[in-house]
From Swiss-Prot:
Inner membrane component of the type II secretion system required for the energy-dependent secretion of extracellular factors such as proteases and toxins from the periplasm. Plays a role in the complex assembly and recruits PulM resulting in a stable complex in the inner membrane. Provides thus a link between the energy-providing PulE protein in the cytoplasm and the rest of the T2SS machinery. Keywords: Cell inner membrane, Cell membrane, Membrane, Protein transport, Transmembrane, Transmembrane helix, Transport. The gene is pulL. One of its GO terms (biological process) is protein secretion by the type II secretion system. Gene3D superfamilies: 3.30.420.370, 3.30.420.380, General secretion pathway protein M, EpsM. Type II secretion system is composed of four main components: the outer membrane complex, the inner membrane complex, the cytoplasmic secretion ATPase and the periplasm-spanning pseudopilus. Forms homodimers. Interacts with PulM/GspM. Interacts with PulE/GspE and PulF/GspF. Residues 1-248 are cytoplasmic. This is Type II secretion system protein L. It is found in: Cell inner membrane. GO terms for cellular component: Gram-negative-bacterium-type cell wall; plasma membrane; type II protein secretion system complex. The chain crosses the membrane at residues 249-265. Belongs to the GSP L family.
Length: 398
């Protein structure tokens, strides 16, 4: 999914070919004659690079490098579907989970449409975009730029491939030489709205006025909302470098306050008495970290005061480092949610209560944590939507 709003302004539409070395492009500008062209790395034609300096780019990538899936989420994973996708699809993949990127195309309650792409392929596509200096609006599988036919398929020929959009969130690319064999053996083939001259193959073709892939994409700007750049590959916002002396405090603030607000209050906010529960949860969480303080009036303000003291005195550098390491491990492990967090100063240890969508997710989290901590496993309880339990992470320098 993509947060960019569609626009009537000029957009550079680029289709990166399956060879990942060449591309075709079209400048779609309302009211103007469209410019089109091809890009080759050795041609020395600067046209595409010059256009990229003035116009945002919508990049279509080969669906032949994508796999489309539908999955049903467990009840407990509805709010954080991205973390569960890898484990739900693991048995259907031809590659290792760690080598795959999962993009959520659409979610309706527990029903999810997902595109799976090799992480190496995503890196190569992004590197290609960066090499041309593209300001990328979206990275979209090419078949999803075709019009959606509610009663059947839509199709267009692009180079040596036929592209088919088979439903709202899925499609396929077929090499021309294999098209006859594919369609001949397809049972109950849906009507095919065809935007290229139909091949001489027996199929329920419905010929339409000829348009190429980029023309169809230009007429379907809503498809820009479909974007593979999610998770590790999400667009990075440009920002000014942070002065080095502030970084430890910022890391601590983000780790403490993010974990505080996003995780520890999650279950409380689901209750009817949201305000009272949130206030009490804030105080309870604050007391976990500062157990000697009896008078807790404004936890957020008091936390900020402690952070200022940490900056001025250079206090708790090891704790800041460990919180940063823990946050990174959680970010890198799909299907994990931190429920509570406390620090045992006597043992120099972080104490966690976590929930996971599966025992495999929990084991993956534990393995990653062992690279930075000594991990002790406490009580574990199976649940309908996964497993929850307690872990103690002791610093290796203790």
């Amino acid at each position: 999914m993509n947060n960019h709003h569609t626009s009537s302004a000029a957009v550079l539409i680029i289709r990166l070919n399956p060879d990942a070395a060449t591309a075709i492009w079209r400048l779609a500008a309302p009211g103007d004659t469209a410019q089109t062209g091809e890009w080759h790395p050795d041609a020395g034609d600067p046209t595409l690079s010059l256009l990229a300096q003035r116009h945002p780019a919508w990049v279509l990538v080969p669906a032949s490098d994508c796999a489309f899936h539908r999955v049903a989420l467990p009840a407990g994973a509805r709010r954080r579907p991205q973390q569960a996708l890898a484990f739900l699809l693991e048995e259907q993949l031809a590659t290792e989970v760690e080598e795959s990127h999962f993009a959520l195309l659409h979610q309706h309650k527990t029903d999810c449409a997902v595109a799976v792409v090799g992480r190496g392929k995503m890196r190569a596509w992004q590197a290609w975009c960066d090499s041309l200096g593209l300001s990328v609006l979206a990275l979209t599988p090419d078949v999803l730029a075709l019009p959606h036919s509610p009663t059947g398929w839509s199709a267009v020929r692009c180079g040596e491939q036929w592209l088919f959009r088979c439903d709202t969130w899925g499609g396929m690319a077929v090499e021309t030489v294999w098209l006859d064999q594919l369609l001949t053996h397809w049972q109950d083939l849906a009507p095919i709205a065809c935007y290229s001259p139909p091949p001489d193959i027996a199929a329920p073709w419905q010929p339409l006025p000829a348009q190429d892939l980029l023309q169809l994409a230009a007429a379907n700007p809503d498809a820009r909302r479909i974007c593979l750049r999610q998770g590790d590959f999400a667009a990075k916002r440009r920002r000014q470098p942070t002065p080095r002396r502030w970084r430890p405090v910022i890391v601590a603030a983000l780790a403490l306050l993010l974990l505080w607000s996003s995780n520890c209050l999650h279950d409380h906010l689901m209750l009817g008495q949201q305000a009272d529960a949130a206030v009490q949860a804030s105080r309870d969480f604050y007391r976990q970290w500062f157990q000697t303080e009896k008078n807790v009036v404004n936890p957020r303000l008091q936390m900020q005061q402690h952070l200022r003291q940490m900056k001025n005195a250079g206090a708790r550098p090891a704790l800041i480092s460990r919180l940063g390491a823990l946050q990174q491990i959680i970010d890198d492990t799909p299907g994990i949610r931190l429920r509570t967090l406390s620090f045992d100063a006597a043992r120099n240890a972080l104490q966690l209560e976590i929930s996971a969508v599966s025992s495999q997710a929990l084991e993956q989290f534990s393995q990653r944590a062992r690279a930075r901590f000594r991990v002790q496993t406490g009580e574990m309880k199976p649940r309908a939507d996964g497993i929850e339990g307690r872990l103690t992470l002791e610093g290796n320098d203790a």
